[in-house]
């Protein structure tokens, strides 16, 4: 099985489809149209090489269609069908493979440009080079920039990025989500990371720069409130 819920549309891009080499060997593939195919929420698909594989996830409800019923209809993961497939069909009629390829290429290129801007600034730490159009990074408070980071320092940075993400969301001018995971260079310690998703086809570099500028501005304010300016050793108590 291949979970291609997010990355599946990469196949439409001649430039990037090599990232999914081998997917044709899968027995089943999941794909969410409401992500990179830009159609309404709930357009999820399970693609099966052999249709009878659907029988392995079959469930009969005793109050509806039973095995002895005359007409069981088509097997499906949905009960009442909202016809979301029409959204997908309309999008393909409008954009086609070439249109989706242009969107995929542009978004993946934007993610790489954002990664370059992050990597070039001492106040940010890029966790890894983006493969598609998702990237994770974190903002480093001024007193820890350019220093070797141990577990205690990472705990300070975690608290700093939680506060930063909340402040940016509350301000309402720009937004990224946050996540938590271990990064190999820091061992098994969970790190709080900022998570950017480059999906809107109308995003330009000026928007990306504006988002990062917002984080720098808010980060400076938060650092002055969160950390002791005289010792710079940890959160103010």
Please identify what each model-predicted range represents:
Residues 167-190:
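Conserved PLP cofactor-binding pocket of PLP-dependent enzymes
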Residues 147, 185-237:
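PLP-dependent enzyme catalytic core of the Aspartate aminotransferase-like
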Residues 126-168:
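Conserved PLP-binding catalytic core of the aspartate aminotransferase-like
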Residues 30, 107-108, 118, 127, ...:
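C-terminal, well-structured subdomains that either form a transmembrane helix-short loop-helix hairpin
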Residues 1-14:
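Catalytic PLP-binding core of fold-type I/II PLP enzymes
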Residues 5-6, 61-63, 106-109, 128-138, ...:
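A glycine-rich phosphate-binding loop feature that marks nucleotide/adenosyl-phosphate handling sites
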């Amino acid at each position: 099985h291949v979970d291609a819920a997010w990355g599946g549309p990469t196949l439409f891009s001649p430039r990037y489809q090599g990232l999914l080499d081998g997917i044709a060997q899968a027995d089943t593939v999941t794909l969410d149209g409401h992500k990179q195919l830009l159609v309404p929420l709930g357009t999820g698909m399970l693609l099966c090489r052999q249709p009878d594989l659907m029988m392995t996830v079959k469930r009969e409800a005793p109050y509806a269609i039973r095995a002895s019923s005359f007409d069981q209809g088509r097997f499906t993961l949905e009960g009442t069908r909202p016809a979301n497939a029409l959204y997908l069909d309309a999008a393909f009629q409008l954009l086609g493979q070439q249109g989706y390829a242009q969107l995929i290429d542009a978004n993946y290129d934007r993610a790489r440009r954002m990664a370059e801007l992050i990597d070039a600034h001492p106040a940010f730490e890029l966790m890894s080079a983006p493969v598609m159009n998702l990237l994770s990074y974190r903002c480093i408070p001024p007193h820890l920039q350019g220093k070797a980071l141990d577990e205690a320092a990472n705990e300070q940075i975690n608290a700093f990025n939680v506060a930063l993400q909340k402040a940016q969301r509350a301000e309402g001018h720009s937004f990224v989500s946050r996540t938590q995971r271990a990064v190999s260079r820091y061992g098994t310690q969970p790190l709080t990371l900022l998570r950017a998703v480059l999906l809107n086809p109308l995003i330009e570099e000026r928007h990306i720069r504006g988002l990062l500028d917002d984080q720098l501005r808010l980060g400076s304010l938060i650092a002055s409130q969160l950390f002791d300016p005289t010792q710079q050793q940890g959160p103010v108590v």
